[in-house]
Amino acid sequence: MRRILLVALTLLVAWPSTASAWGFTAHRLIMRRAIDLLPPEIKPFFDHFREQIVDRVTSPDEWRTVGWDDDPNHFLDFGVPEYGKYPFSELPREYGAAVEKFGLVALKRNGLLPWRAAEEFGNLRRAFEEFARTTPYATSNVVLFAPVMAHYIQDAYQPFHATDNYDGQQTGNTGIHARFERDLVERFETKLTIAPAPPKPITNARDAAFDALLASYQLVDPILKADKEAVAGKERYDDDYFQKFFDKVRPILERRLSEAVTATAGAIIGAWQQAGRPALRTEDARPVQRVRPARQ
């Protein structure tokens, strides 16, 4: 079953997409820098598969373009009335309690990101555990689940994945989602200073995602204010607008990207440690196929 899943997901990775979360450039930047922070016990493995892992970190965005119902897994809409005021304690962190309180339909409508991050953290931990049992396709599963988990962790650091005003539609900032997460990074990538802190192992991906989303939510208003100031008096979002916008939000953008790098590395390390710190092979331990010699 895992082999079939791996093949299916690999095909989807190659599918073209117009949708994005942090933006493909940002997700891949974060993933590359996160690999650099991994400890020596596992860094050689991730370096060996660096190109594949960096490429696959955008897969969850690509899945949505081929009909997978994955949208709710990329956000959590803080700000909706039913969750109360910041820090939104009306929303239980335990999934079963949240479903019981709000119902699955409403919960899904407002986003499932922390629980998806936890699910993929578990998938990665189990993939690491397979190394200790010499399970076929353990290597392939880690190369698959590490970037998939990383994607959802990274989304929690994008402020507009943490608010019901996710595209500035409530405040006259329509389109801000892409301008902040994609356009700024693509235009100014070479000028960004990414300075991640040394990672600490993440032991609870759900709570880590919740905490990151709460921090993201508090950055929404300053970004919206900067957007309005940068576009004031203009009829279009020209180069001058983007330069002004970047100058105003650069500290926020650099900080969230840096923190996403640290969290990505911390989640990978945490999953590996919970799996018992197995030694990682760069080849799958597939069973030997024994063929009977033909009768003479």
Regions found by a protein language model. Give the residues of each.
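Bacterial N-terminal signal peptides
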Residues: 7-15
